[in-house]
Amino acid sequence: MARARRRTRPTVLSDRQAGGGSLPAQTGAKRRTAVLRRLYPLLAFLGGFTWDALTIGQRVRVVDFWRLGAFLVGAALLALWLARREALDRAPPAPAATLRGRLASLAWQAPYLLLQFFFGGIFSALFILYFKSSGHLGTWLTASFLAALLVGNEFAGNRYGRRFTLTWTLFALNAILLCNFALPHALGSLQPLWFYASTVAGATLTHILRWLAPGRPGRIGPSWALAVVLMLAFRLDMIAPVPLVKRQLAAGQDFVQASGRYSLQVERAAWWQWWRDQAEIVHVPEGGRLYGLSAVFAPIGVTADLEHRWEVRDPDGWRLVYRRPFTTTGGRDRGFRGYSWVLNPPPGDWRFIVATQDGRTIDILRLQVVRGTPAANEVLVREID
């Protein structure tokens, strides 16, 4: 009689015996990896932003325009490459664990990453430049919009290659904002005409780029719509008067001009008003003068027609009390200085404004004038050299 064969049971190894670690440990590692992947764009953004803030510094240099122009050319070439790949209907490589498969996957993703890098580099630098040129709510909103795009770019990834309308629109925004800076700088003039011309030039450049792209993917209409929105924002004084950058703004008494230095007595801001250079309240004695000082940087070769405006709030709104026009010549690192004053200003709410003579606001200092003399321990001297 044949011996019955014994059925063997397969050996089942636990997760720890199989060398894979416990299931909770594997899950935790995957979660940490996922979190790091999500944080990587933010860390890259902070690193790039810090680098631009340090390298661009406190003034606009010609080398900055050349660098940003190179980024824009790189973005244009990558957009054409992605359009060609789209027209050839090439599929991404299949996932593989081998070195060759990983290199193929990296090569496929490289254009997306480089385009993201170029857009991020331009957005970061332009945000810093527009941030430095912003001086009131409207321009702060525009700078905040650029900041939102800067952060959003870090999470866009390969959407640029799959949604060409987005690619053309962001390219148009980069080209327009860069031309808004570069054209006035090259011509040495801040006439409003150059803003409109540079805006149309940036949109036209994008239109030509799409026309050259194989298959002409995506739509160009949103790029032109963006140009119209920017020109409307310019009319509403929501675009900072680039490339002008406000250095200092102060209002007070006992103005002294000596040995190439301007000094002014101002009142200290409260300890918790860390963002203010001086107190909002200004004490002015009967018959006294209230002085205003400004320092505005303009690049070498740029001439700007500026003005000081003193306005007081009436029951019907803000009323112009005094306006002093003057012309700046660019190139001074600490900014071109100007001063003005009002005699015996009545108590109430005041605004000291430095702006271009065509109406674009550079900065606003809000004040509350009261009669009297400030306490000695609340006074300090500010110098603008």
Regions found by a protein language model. Give the residues of each.
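Solvent-exposed serine/threonine-rich low-complexity stretches and specific carbohydrate-binding patches
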Residues: L320-G331
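Short, aromatic- and glycine-rich surface loops/edge beta-strands on solvent-exposed regions
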Residues: P347-D358
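Membrane-anchoring hydrophobic segments
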Residues: M1-F155
